[in-house]
């Protein structure tokens, strides 16, 4: 029987909601936001999982690649579209968001987003760090120049 799992990711913990093809809740709960813990949480459903969905966020590249490496069929969903669909819910909680994401995943009402490759992420990180260092260097030089300007 096809099973769909949705992850509502936050920094410390992730809300997990698992549904079958009819939308019946098979399991819901929390797990640590770590690929090992999430894979362990989803292990009882691993043979039947059709898709594991998570919204785009700062952790989605890491979690997506790590969970795919553990053999899970991860799909990264566009957060703006998912937010628009989930904004009609009355009680907005992480658990309800995970439930809504699971139903969007099951119905196919989501836009898939490509996860960036590790090489792209590393290059972007280096460029961003270089830009921050240059900005700090310029700020220090300007501060010294301003302090010395009063001395002539």
Stretches found by the model and what they are:
Residues 1-152:
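Phosphate- and other anionic-substrate recognition elements at nucleic-acid/protein interfaces
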